[in-house]
Regions:
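Short gly/ser/thr-rich secondary-structure transition/capping motifs
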Residues: 1-3, 21-25, 148-150
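Short, Lys/Arg-rich amphipathic segments at extreme N-termini
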Residues: 14-33, 201
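Generic preference for hydrophobic
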Residues: 19, 25, 38, 60-61, ...
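Glycine-rich, highly charged phosphate/nucleotide-binding loops
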Residues: 22-24, 89-94
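Catalytic core of membrane glycerolipid acyltransferases/transacylases, capturing the structured
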Residues: 30-89, 96
Length: 229
C-alpha cells in the first residue's frame, strides 16, 4: 500500500491489491484477532475484491448475481465468497456465515446496505450484520470505503485510476443475549442504527482522503424505517 502521514503501510494479500495499486488502508490496528462481522459501505463491484487487501483472511457474503460474470465469479470464490440470494431468506448462506464465526478464526464480510447504493448517504441498514454478531457474540467492525464509485462506477466493466481509501473503525460490541440466550429485536435494531452512524462517519472521512468529499442534498436525511426485503 501507499504510505502516507497517518496511514499505515500494510502488506498486500493476493487479490485486487496485486493489480490495483492506488488504495490505502487506515485503522488496521482496529482489526480484532479472532472472528468478527466486517461491515463496509457498498458503492461499487470492486468493494468485495478490494477487501482482500486487508491483512486477514476474510470470508464474504455476496449477492448471487455477482457470480453471473465469469471473472468476478472466479475471483469472489477464490477470495472466500459464498453467494446469498438477496430478497429471500437464504438459510444455507446464513448457516455458512454462522459456522465461520462460531469457528472463531475468520471475519465474515456482510455489506449491511444489502446491495450497491449510490450517493453520499448511508440509509437504514438491514439487520443481518447485527444478527450474525448477536448469535455468535462476536464484535462488528464498521468500515468506510471511499473512492470506489469513481474507480469503477455503476455499469462500468473497467477500473479507472482513481484514489481508493479504506478506513477500519473500532469494533462495536454485539447486541446482548438475555439469560435464555435469546435476542431482543429492539437491541438488534439499535445496534444496526449505531452501525449505520459509524459507517457514515468513516465513509465521509474516506471520501475526504480521496479528494471527493460527500455533499448532502437538502432533505436527503435518512429516516428510521427498516429497508424492505
Amino acid at each position: 500500500f501507499q504510505a502516507e502521514d497517518g496511514i499505515r503501510d500494510q502488506p498486500r494479500s493476493r487479490g485486487l491489491g496485486d493489480v490495483y495499486k492506488r488504495q490505502t488502508v487506515e485503522g488496521a490496528e482496529n482489526i480484532p484477532a479472532g472472528a468478527c462481522v466486517w461491515a463496509p459501505n457498498h458503492r461499487s463491484y470492486i468493494d468485495t475484491p478490494l477487501q482482500s487487501c486487508i491483512p486477514r483472511r476474510l470470508r464474504f457474503m455476496g449477492k448471487d448475481s455477482m457470480w453471473e460474470n465469469w471473472f468476478f465469479g472466479w475471483l469472489f470464490t477464490t477470495i472466500g465468497c459464498f453467494p446469498v440470494s438477496r430478497g429471500s431468506a437464504d438459510r444455507a448462506a446464513l448457516v455458512t456465515a454462522l459456522g465461520v464465526l462460531e469457528n472463531g478464526n475468520d471475519p465474515v464480510v456482510a455489506f449491511p446496505e444489502g446491495e450497491r447504493k449510490d450517493g453520499p448517504r448511508i440509509f437504514p441498514l438491514f439487520d443481518g450484520a447485527a444478527y450474525l454478531a448477536a448469535k455468535t457474540q462476536v464484535p462488528i467492525v464498521p468500515v468506510g470505503i471511499g473512492g470506489t464509485a469513481k474507480a469503477m462506477p455503476r455499469g462500468s466493466k473497467l477500473l479507472y485510476p482513481k484514489r481508493i481509501h479504506v478506513i477500519i473503525g473500532k469494533p462495536m460490541p454485539p447486541p446482548p443475549l438475555n439469560e435464555k440466550g435469546r435476542l431482543s429485536r429492539n437491541d438488534v435494531r439499535a445496534t444496526t442504527e449505531t452501525l449505520r452512524e459509524e459507517i457514515q462517519v468513516l465513509f465521509d472521512q474516506a471520501q475526504v482522503v480521496c479528494g471527493d468529499p460527500n455533499v448532502y442534498e437538502p432533505g436527503s436525511e435518512p429516516d428510521s424505517r427498516v429497508p424492505e426485503e
